[in-house]
Design a protein with these regions (language model features):
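Beta-strand-enriched, solvent-exposed domains that form extended recognition/catalytic surfaces
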Residues: 1-87
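Active-site environment of divalent metal-dependent phosphoester hydrolases
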Residues: 104-108, 159-164, 187-192, 218-221, ...
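Extended active-site neighborhood of metal-dependent phosphoesterases/phosphodiesterases
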Residues: 70-76, 80-88, 163-238, 266-278, ...
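A short C-terminal boundary segment appended to hydrolase-like catalytic domains
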Residues: 36, 329-376
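Active-site-proximal beta-strand elements of phosphoester/diester hydrolases
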Residues: 93-106, 208-217, 245-247, 306-313, ...
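N-terminal active-site segment of His-dependent metallophosphoesterases
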Residues: 18-23, 64-71, 75-162
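His/acidic metal-ligating clusters that form di-metal
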Residues: 139-150, 211, 220-308, 358-376
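Acidic/histidine-rich helix-loop elements
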Residues: 100-134, 190-196, 218-225, 259-264, ...
Length: 376
């Protein structure tokens, strides 16, 4: 840190981002290079630079810890105390990761396409790598370090659905080898209706089966699930001897909602009700996981046995997210991670203020939206 500066004057946007059964991650930025100490319980780590990501491991499940970032006052996003998640019962059987809304080919960020844009609209700096390449490179690096059994990319692989953009996605994510599985999103079916048409399909892992649905209605942003796919899902879930988790690009409509709009931004009401019916009848299904909305959110529908109905924030801008899943004999834990390479954090610090400053709270979600443990 420069002489004459105080840490308390230069720390910004400190967030307790990830809370697991045995680890936490705190992120923040400083004005210029600074050395900052973060304390969790009796552990402390000092980090240096402008963008800081502090990971503390070796914590005990369901235990309260004190948290302190020297020079930062406690806030709603940086509480002075927190409690770690419960650990699912039984042995850990598998680990997998997901990403969504990676948007290869996108060149501007923050545009709604309405007559009156809220702004700001952001671009990569001239001569710099495109921000989708920067963000996805960071995600891939961190996922490779996790060494998961599988990676599911839940759609919006591209910006406009061109062959060149799709190839850029494949070139990047091929680093993950045969562990990588992907399904299209609405952006991928705007030009061609044949890109990434792989679903429905299953991915068999130790202790769990992943079922992937194609929720795209080509040419439009809202989604559907065909009756053929729902019949397939019910058949494979009914026959499964293992718990099952279901993935698609679009999120379901809430069957308890009084507003029934056939152009709902996610899966249309009729198909959402049918999907919830399958979840209700098939007790092997332990959750549904989507992207599309660019936010972290977890809902529970009585019409779907109150299993988690999950949306995960996008890779391409704030907060720059990917999700880790730890599968145990007795359940699973979801941990949403912030992509923390310096280049990625530099971009997401710019984009957190999009849409007239409203984007941070929308995209980030609560701690419970990002990290939770669910029993089978």
């Amino acid at each position: 840190m420069c002489a004459g500066s105080r840490v308390g004057d230069v720390i910004h946007d400190a967030e307790l981002f990830t809370v697991g059964p045995d680890e936490v991650v705190v992120t923040f930025r400083t004005d210029g290079d600074a050395s900052v100490t973060t304390v969790v319980g009796d552990q402390e780590i000092s980090t240096n630079g402008s963008y800081h990501s502090v990971r503390m491991t070796g914590l005990e499940p369901e235990t309260e810890y004190e948290l302190r970032v020297d020079g930062a006052e406690p806030t709603d996003l940086l509480p002075g105390r927190f409690t770690t998640l419960a650990q699912p019962k039984g042995a850990r059987l598998a680990t997998f990761a997901t990403v969504n809304d990676v948007h290869f080919g996108e060149v501007e960020c923050g545009r709604l396409g309405t007559p009156e844009e809220l702004g700001p609209i952001l671009f990569s700096e001239p001569g710099a790598d495109p921000y989708p390449a920067v963000m996805n490179a960071g995600a891939i690096t961190e996922i490779e370090a996790l060494d998961p059994d599988a990676v599911v990319v839940k759609g919006d692989l591209t910006d406009r659905g061109t062959g060149e953009e799709y190839q850029a996605f494949l070139d990047a994510y091929s680093q993950l080898g045969t562990r990588m599985h992907h399904v299209r999103g609405n952006h991928d079916a705007m030009v061609s209706h044949t890109i990434a048409v792989h679903a429905p399909n299953t991915i068999a892992l130790p202790g769990v089966t992943l079922a992937v649905l194609d929720t795209v209605r080509p040419g439009v942003e809202h989604g559907r699930v065909t009756s053929e796919q729902l019949e397939w899902l019910e058949e494979v879930a009914s026959a499964s001897t293992k718990p099952m988790l279901v993935f698609g690009h679009h999120h379901p409509w809430d069957p308890s909602s009084s507003e029934r709009n056939e152009t709902y931004f996610g899966i249309n009401p009729d198909d959402s009700e049918a999907l919830c019916g399958v979840i209700t009848r098939c007790e092997s299904i332990g959750g549904y996981f989507a992207g599309h909305t660019h936010r972290n959110r977890v809902r529970h529908f009585e019409a779907a046995r109150n299993v988690p109905i999950v949306e995960i924030a996008c890779v391409k801008d704030y907060p720059g997210a990917w999700a880790e899943y730890r599968v145990h004999e007795g359940g699973y834990t979801q941990l949403v991670h912030r992509i923390s390479t310096p280049a990625a954090m530099a971009w997401t610090e710019k984009t957190r203020g999009m849409f007239a400053g409203l984007y941070r709270d929308y995209a980030l979600g609560s701690q419970r939206d990002r990290s939770f443990t669910q029993s089978w």
